């Protein structure tokens, strides 16, 4: 039944609290899955107090159970364990809190845990979070390495010592986090995101020295996997558990089998790089020496040729041939010029014989009127008309006295 209230007639707090308590009470017993975040056993009390945390969201709820139920659990219930409870929810109106009273507690077995992790893996893989094309290469020599690990842990010591042994100048920015237990996933997420925001950090290493499947459950937390998928900085997972890798190994850009292996992956070995430089220098020196020797041999071969040993020998061998060719060219040119001169004289004689001047020299003349037109007929000249006569060596000016027309056939 809905609670009736309005601005004019608001419901008091007690009424709201009692209504919520009634709704929760009518809910009945429920099966609840979660991770035990805290266990508190108070001396003299027959009740054990637990805190149950959601596996994905940052939500927790207090749980109570009888000491008899708690002590009868096998294996014993410890913090970080995954459980399924059959519990009756209760709402305490005076405090405004919700709690569960557990009537049955079942430990989640390893097989069931692995099956759930596999279903989660398939779901995240279907979203593309583990795609190979998303993997980013690690920088060759990072300026600063971000390290997420537990304080004073063997994993921290292994990463720092091995990295500095390989490259003494490497710098680390360490973000400590719980690497086991109910707070582990949220603290690792916070540490990774803080390092990702640091512009000096070029690669992040999440390191832990192995552990059981239950111990490594935080590194398969869905919220952690999605957080690592979102960051921009390359990340190396160094959880160190070969048989059943946590999902962090799949979303990380590089997986290292151990923290020591992670140190070898994120920084180069200065001694090995120095050896590589020496080997490269020796290879370059050898290649240069071989090239110089090859070119020197070719130059020596050219120098040993007779033509290069005494260049005048080649000129002397060709001198007589050049002289002969020059004489032959001169003779051929002389003959050609003589023939050309004869041809020119012949053509000149023919031209002279055929020219009008030669005709005039044989006694012929050309008669022209006063306008310079050649007179070819007696009809073109009138008596007493001025005319000129062109002869071989000059011109005669005359005046016609009369004309006479001749018969051409008789002429």
Curated annotation (Swiss-Prot):
This is Exodeoxyribonuclease 7 large subunit. InterPro entries: Exonuc_VII_L, Exonuc_VII_lsu_C, OB-fold_nuc-bd_dom. One of its GO terms (molecular function) is exodeoxyribonuclease VII activity. Bidirectionally degrades single-stranded DNA into large acid-insoluble oligonucleotides, which are then degraded further into small acid-soluble oligonucleotides. It comes from Nocardioides sp. (strain ATCC BAA-499 / JS614). It comes from the Bacteria. Its EC number is 3.1.11.6. The keyword Nuclease applies. It is found in: Cytoplasm. Keywords: Cytoplasm, Exonuclease, Hydrolase, Nuclease.
